UniProtKB/Swiss-Prot annotation:
<keyword id="KW-0732">Signal</keyword>
<dbReference type="InterPro" id="IPR001314">
    <property type="entry name" value="Peptidase_S1A"/>
</dbReference>
<dbReference type="InterPro" id="IPR001254">
    <property type="entry name" value="Trypsin_dom"/>
</dbReference>
<dbReference type="GO" id="GO:0001669">
    <property type="term" value="C:acrosomal vesicle"/>
</dbReference>
<feature type="disulfide bond">
    <location>
        <begin position="40"/>
        <end position="56"/>
    </location>
</feature>
<protein>
    <recommendedName>
        <fullName>Probable inactive serine protease 37</fullName>
    </recommendedName>
</protein>
<dbReference type="GO" id="GO:0005576">
    <property type="term" value="C:extracellular region"/>
</dbReference>
<keyword id="KW-1015">Disulfide bond</keyword>
<dbReference type="GO" id="GO:0016477">
    <property type="term" value="P:cell migration"/>
</dbReference>
<dbReference type="GO" id="GO:0046872">
    <property type="term" value="F:metal ion binding"/>
</dbReference>
<dbReference type="GO" id="GO:0051604">
    <property type="term" value="P:protein maturation"/>
</dbReference>
<keyword id="KW-0964">Secreted</keyword>
<comment type="similarity">
    <text>Belongs to the peptidase S1 family.</text>
</comment>
<comment type="function">
    <text>Plays a role in male fertility. May have a role in sperm migration or binding to zona-intact eggs. Involved in the activation of the proacrosin/acrosin system.</text>
</comment>
<keyword id="KW-0968">Cytoplasmic vesicle</keyword>
<keyword id="KW-0479">Metal-binding</keyword>
<dbReference type="GO" id="GO:0006508">
    <property type="term" value="P:proteolysis"/>
</dbReference>
Length: 235
């Protein structure tokens, strides 16, 4: 149910080559969707709204924001229940297309340095653009079920033609493909690479399990901006 790199299977050991991309608790727009089943990652797009993959529609969902480190509390932690979940009208559990949903929070998130909304893309991204990929992972000392770290890495966007030639991308529409060229600075067991951020705007969000090799497939958020904005109207 979540987007996972199995590092030893794909390419062995990953190392982060660009430490400048990393900082203390980056990606304050990421939220953790906690449930009794497999967890997922979403993006805060407004204080009261989260955008997430539709396959993350799970029972007993809780939205966690702010600091995720269980051993260190800093007052930014927030857990908010959803009061409304709207999946994209054309989404089907049997296909990876249109894998988007909007979650309305029971109360607006309190914004702080570790809780910030992310603007939506206003244009399509050009092939070759190097974008930021954000996700959640588990620190080496974390043996629990839930991730405790945010991580970023950089990767270039592929052209639609290149994407369609890959095994992962050939059956997708309204998709965004990225090619992973960075490597991790230390070994992780799992990495949930959930979002693509281009020029400080949300350009892509994970599509089910459709990642393999060195290519990641994401829903192209720009293609759905009208639906998102019409649905997530704060009254």
């Amino acid at each position: 149910m979540k987007f996972i790199f199995y590092l030893s299977v794909l390419t062995g050991t990953f190392l982060f080559a660009d430490s400048s991309v990393q900082k203390e608790d980056p990606a304050p727009y990421l939220v953790y969707l906690k449930s009794h089943f497999n967890p997922c990652v979403g993006v805060l797009i407004k204080p009261s709204w989260v955008l997430a993959p539709a396959h993350c529609y799970l029972p007993n969902l809780e939205v966690m924001l702010g600091n995720f480190k269980s051993r260190v509390r800093d007052g930014t932690e927030q857990t908010i229940n959803p009061i409304q979940i709207v999946r994209y009208w054309n989404y089907s559990d049997s296909a990876p297309q249109d894998d988007l949903m909007l979650i309305k929070l029971a109360k607006p998130a309190m914004l702080n340095p570790k809780v910030q909304p992310l603007p939506l893309a206003t244009t399509n991204v050009r092939p070759g653009t190097v974008c930021l990929l954000s996700g959640l992972d588990w620190s080496q000392e974390n043996s629990g079920r839930h991730p405790d770290l945010r991580q970023n890495l950089e990767a270039p966007v592929m052209s639609d033609k290149e994407c369609q030639k890959t095994e992962q991308g050939k059956s997708h529409r309204n998709s965004l493909c990225v090619k992973f060229v960075k490597v991790f600075s230390r070994i992780f067991g799992e990495v949930a690479v959930a979002t693509v951020i281009c020029k400080d705007k949300l350009q892509g969000i994970e599509v089910g399990h459709f990642m393999g090799g060195d290519v990641g497939i994401y829903t192209n958020v720009y293609k759905y901006v009208s639906w998102i904005e019409n649905t997530a109207k704060d009254k």
